[in-house]
């Protein structure tokens, strides 16, 4: 069970476990590519790789150079919202993705190299923090660029509005569970845009296994059931949310949808 294994596995392993459940992932192919990349990185950092040549910089700079220059991992602007770009496994095979999928991979390779790296679920983006000699370095995994405070604040304002100001709490590292939930929400959003409601429902079910009874997850599952014309369970989910969060701004919309579904069921009978 994913939720039981979470304390014992790495971020990358957990992401791949979820994709194996959602997408019937060919793990042998992915693991073979991952093992090859790991071996290449070890050789590159040791300066003994005939393919890459030596590296005399700092280890973390070597990892970034190998990741972005040698392997040519890159952010996919053109198909940013495609479901494939939410798949870490496809990132390994195709060497492109979103800030989140590339960030999961970058954290993995940095940690594999003995470095202290963390993922940050930044508003509208995903960042990687490197801890070097009691100094924090922030990396944009979409392109490997180091980010200044001003650059990160611009990203924050792009996500939250021009009045937003960057605070230290915005840069706190997130745990595996938080990052996996962000990944699942991203997957679910891509599937909903593609009208893949059954697979989106599977994402929702995993999210509720990670946060049992969470009213917002239950409400969102209700919207998916509504799209699938499963009105009885959609009504149950909406009523659960209304009971748990009676002052939420979405209550009016939910009550309207419940009335519409009740009417539809009456007409069908």
Regions found by a protein language model. Give the residues of each.
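A structural boundary/capping signal
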Residues: 1-269
């Amino acid at each position: 069970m994913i939720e039981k294994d979470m304390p014992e596995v790495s971020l990358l392993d957990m992401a791949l476990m979820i994709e194996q459940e959602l997408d019937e992932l060919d793990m042998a192919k992915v693991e073979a590519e991952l093992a090859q990349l790991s071996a290449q990185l070890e050789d590159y950092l040791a300066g003994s790789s005939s393919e890459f040549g030596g590296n005399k910089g700092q280890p973390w700079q070597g990892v970034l150079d190998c990741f972005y220059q040698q392997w040519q991992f890159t952010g996919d602007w053109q198909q940013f919202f495609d479901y494939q770009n939410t798949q870490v496994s496809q990132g390994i095979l195709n060497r492109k993705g979103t800030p989140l999928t590339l960030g999961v991979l970058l954290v993995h390779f940095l940690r594999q190299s003995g470095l202290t790296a963390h993922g940050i679920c930044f508003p509208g983006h995903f960042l990687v923090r490197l801890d070097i000699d009691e100094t924090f370095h922030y990396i944009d995994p979409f392109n490997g660029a180091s980010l200044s405070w001003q650059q990160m604040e611009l990203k924050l304002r792009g996500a939250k509005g021009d009045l937003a100001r960057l605070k230290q709490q915005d840069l706190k590292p997130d745990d595996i569970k938080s990052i996996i939930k962000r990944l699942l929400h991203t997957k679910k959003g891509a599937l909903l845009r593609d009208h893949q409601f059954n697979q989106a429902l599977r994402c929702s079910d995993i999210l509720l296994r990670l946060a049992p009874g969470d009213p917002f997850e239950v409400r969102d599952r209700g919207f998916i059931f509504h799209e699938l014309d499963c009105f009885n369970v959609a009504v149950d989910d909406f009523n659960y949310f209304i009971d748990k969060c009676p002052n939420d701004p979405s209550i009016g919309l939910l009550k309207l949808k419940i009335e519409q579904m009740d009417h539809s069921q009456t007409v069908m009978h």
